[in-house]
Amino acid sequence: MSSSGLQLHIAGKRFGTRQVLRDIDLQLAPGEIVSLIGASGCGKSTLLRILAGLERDYAGEVALDGARVRGVDRQIGFIFQEPRLLPWLDVAANVAFADEADLSPAAARQSARVQQLLAQVGLLDYATALPKQLSGGQAQRVALARGLYRQPRVLLLDEPFSAVDAFTRIKLQDLLLRLAGEHGFSVLLVTHDIDEAVYLSDRVIVIGGQPGTIAHAQRLELPRPRDRQAHEAALRQARQDLLAALHSLHVF
């Protein structure tokens, strides 16, 4: 296994007497986008929490460029399924809160880093808005900006677009691809949407079994930047191949 990028080895993870993950070996290359799919309860979100340093009671290790990661690391960002914005802070302060909790809202609005990120997610005019004034898609854009504030090398996302409508989901998917291309970070995404996994990813990994392990991995030889119309046939074929693999594995 190469020492470049993010490496994960999980010999086992238990909750009480129940083993939820076993024999997981996963590497995420610099700039690579990988999706994790699998049935509910197979351990996908637990795997992300281990990588994020939020779950430490497991047998195995996480490493970045060969150096072991212990606990929460500023080089690894995490985007939750829900935006989880602080309701008493405006948009700018929520973005800066990722690393500068003591920064005043006024100072956050003047921060060049905050302004850059809000411009990149299309919310520069919403810097003074409170979370209750945002749509679901706008709130998740703020969460993306907050996740990038520390300039992570790896971004973990746990079903980040599942709570928004289909049109907003498409826009957020394209935004994620654009941000990943501009910033050069790697992405590990948990999703139940096969079309989303195929469109976004360089690889799709299927977690299956009880306890969960890597049941299948499929590399997607599709060019970047992705284009839904120009690559429609290739995306459709990749989806069919993945569905065939899932049916043969009886994962869902």
From Swiss-Prot:
Its EC number is 7.6.2.14. It catalyses: ATP + H2O + aliphatic sulfonate-[sulfonate-binding protein]Side 1 = ADP + phosphate + aliphatic sulfonateSide 2 + [sulfonate-binding protein]Side 1. Pfam families: ABC_tran. It comes from the Bacteria. Keywords: ATP-binding, Cell inner membrane, Cell membrane, Membrane, Nucleotide-binding, Translocase, Transport. SUPFAM superfamilies: P-loop containing nucleoside triphosphate hydrolases (SSF52540). Belongs to the ABC transporter superfamily. Aliphatic sulfonates importer (TC 3.A.1.17.2) family. This is Aliphatic sulfonates import ATP-binding protein SsuB 1. It comes from Xanthomonas axonopodis pv. citri (strain 306).
